[in-house]
C-alpha cells in the first residue's frame, strides 16, 4: 500500500474531485509545484494551468484550473479554483479560437486594447490547449 494524502479540488460552482492521491502537481505563481504525502504546510496562488494527480494505484488524471489557491496541510491538500474542470471536458476548438483572438488583440496597434487582459486571455487559452494535449497523450 502506498503513502497517500487527501485532495479536494473545488470551484465556485461545485466540487470537482475529492479523494486519495499519491501526488499532486500544479502550476503555482513561481512555476510547477509537486505535492507528495507529508509535504510541509503551504499556501500559494495558482496560475491558469493543469493540475495532474496520481491516484492510489498509479492512475493519472488531469484537470484544468483557471487560477485559485492551493493549500497544503499535514494530511490534506485543497485547491480552491476560480474555474476548474477535467481536461477531457475542455473544448479544444474554443480554446484555439480564444488563443487566436488574444494573439490578434496583442498584435493590433489599436489604442483601445487592454494588453494585460489580452495577455491573461492568451495565457488561459494556452494553458487549456496544453491540458488537452497532455490528456490526449495520456490516452494513447
UniProtKB/Swiss-Prot annotation:
Name of the gene: atpC
UniProt superkingdom: Bacteria
Membrane protein topology class: Peripheral membrane protein
Subcellular location, record wording: Cell inner membrane
Pfam families hit by this protein: ATP-synt_DE (PF00401), ATP-synt_DE_N (PF02823)
Keyword terms, alphabetized: ATP synthesis, Cell inner membrane, Cell membrane, CF(1), Hydrogen ion transport, Ion transport, Membrane, Transport
Subunit structure: F-type ATPases have 2 components, CF(1) - the catalytic core - and CF(0) - the membrane proton channel. CF(1) has five subunits: alpha(3), beta(3), gamma(1), delta(1), epsilon(1). CF(0) has three main subunits: a, b and c.
Keyword Repeat: no
Gene3D superfamilies attached to this UniProt entry: ATP synthase delta/epsilon subunit, C-terminal domain, F0F1 ATP synthase delta/epsilon subunit, N-terminal
SUPFAM superfamilies according to UniProt: Epsilon subunit of F1F0-ATP synthase C-terminal domain, Epsilon subunit of F1F0-ATP synthase N-terminal domain
Matches recorded under PANTHER family: ATP SYNTHASE DELTA/EPSILON CHAIN, ATP SYNTHASE EPSILON CHAIN, CHLOROPLASTIC
GO cellular component: plasma membrane; proton-transporting ATP synthase complex
Role, per record: Produces ATP from ADP in the presence of a proton gradient across the membrane.
MF GO annotations: ATP binding; proton-transporting ATP synthase activity, rotational mechanism
Family: Belongs to the ATPase epsilon chain family.
Name of the protein in question: ATP synthase epsilon chain
